[in-house]
């Protein structure tokens, strides 16, 4: 009968500590790019939906990651990652 491999890897940081550190980093980055009132509203929505649970922490992490990714992708003034508008060969831009 097969056995699961032994966990011989390096000791990992507990998930909840890692998640809280990640959330703190995302919040610090988000306040640089979005109005605080929006972020407060997002936090209220998550709290009303999930309460004070790890599921809520995971949800807000996922949403903040998506918001920041899209924000950078469409052209954040603070970032060099954004899309640069490209012109077509005939000189018109896409609409």
UniProtKB/Swiss-Prot annotation:
GO CC, one annotated term: virion component
InterPro entries, A to Z: RetroV_VpR/X (IPR000012)
Major location (coarse): virion
Record's subcellular location: Virion; Host nucleus; Host extracellular space
Cell cycle recorded as keyword: yes
Keywords: Activator, AIDS, Apoptosis, Cell cycle, Host G2/M cell cycle arrest by virus, Host nucleus, Host-virus interaction, Ion channel, Ion transport, Modulation of host cell cycle by virus, Phosphoprotein, Transcription, Transcription regulation, Transport, Viral penetration into host nucleus, Virion, Virus entry into host cell
Domain of life: Viruses
Modified residue annotations for Phosphoserine: 79, 93, 95
Modification(s) after translation: Phosphorylated on several residues by host. These phosphorylations regulate VPR activity for the nuclear import of the HIV-1 pre-integration complex.
Keyword Transport applies: yes
Ranges for region Homooligomerization: 1-42
Alphabetized Pfam families for the sequence: VPR
Gene Ontology biological process terms, A to Z: DNA-templated transcription; monoatomic ion transmembrane transport; protein homooligomerization; regulation of DNA-templated transcription; symbiont entry into host cell; symbiont-mediated activation of host apoptosis; symbiont-mediated arrest of host cell cycle during G2/M transition; viral penetration into host nucleus
Family recorded in the similarity comment: Belongs to the HIV-1 VPR protein family.
Subunit structure: Homooligomer, may form homodimer. Interacts with p6-gag region of the Pr55 Gag precursor protein through a (Leu-X-X)4 motif near the C-terminus of the P6gag protein. Interacts with host UNG. May interact with host RAD23A/HHR23A. Interacts with host VPRBP/DCAF1, leading to hijack the CUL4A-RBX1-DDB1-DCAF1/VPRBP complex, mediating ubiquitination of host proteins such as TERT and ZGPAT and arrest of the cell cycle in G2 phase.
HAMAP family: HIV_VPR (MF_04080)
Role according to the record: During virus replication, may deplete host UNG protein, and incude G2-M cell cycle arrest. Acts by targeting specific host proteins for degradation by the 26S proteasome, through association with the cellular CUL4A-DDB1 E3 ligase complex by direct interaction with host VPRPB/DCAF-1. Cell cycle arrest reportedly occurs within hours of infection and is not blocked by antiviral agents, suggesting that it is initiated by the VPR carried into the virion. Additionally, VPR induces apoptosis in a cell cycle dependent manner suggesting that these two effects are mechanistically linked.
Note: HIV-1 lineages are divided in three main groups, M (for Major), O (for Outlier), and N (for New, or Non-M, Non-O). The vast majority of strains found worldwide belong to the group M. Group O seems to be endemic to and largely confined to Cameroon and neighboring countries in West Central Africa, where these viruses represent a small minority of HIV-1 strains. The group N is represented by a limited number of isolates from Cameroonian persons. The group M is further subdivided in 9 clades or subtypes (A to D, F to H, J and K).
Protein name: Protein Vpr
Originating organism: Human immunodeficiency virus type 1 group N (isolate YBF30) (HIV-1)
């Amino acid at each position: 009968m097969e056995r699961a491999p032994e966990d011989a890897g390096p000791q990992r940081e507990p998930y909840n500590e890692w998640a809280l550190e990640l959330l703190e980093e995302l919040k610090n980055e988000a306040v640089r790019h979005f109005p605080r009132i929006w972020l407060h509203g997002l936090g209220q929505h998550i709290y009303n939906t999930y309460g004070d649970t790890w599921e809520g922490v995971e949800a807000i992490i996922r949403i903040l990651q998506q918001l920041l990714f899209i924000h950078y992708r469409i052209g954040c003034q603070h970032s060099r990652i954004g899309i640069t508008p490209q012109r077509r060969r005939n000189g018109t831009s896409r609409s």
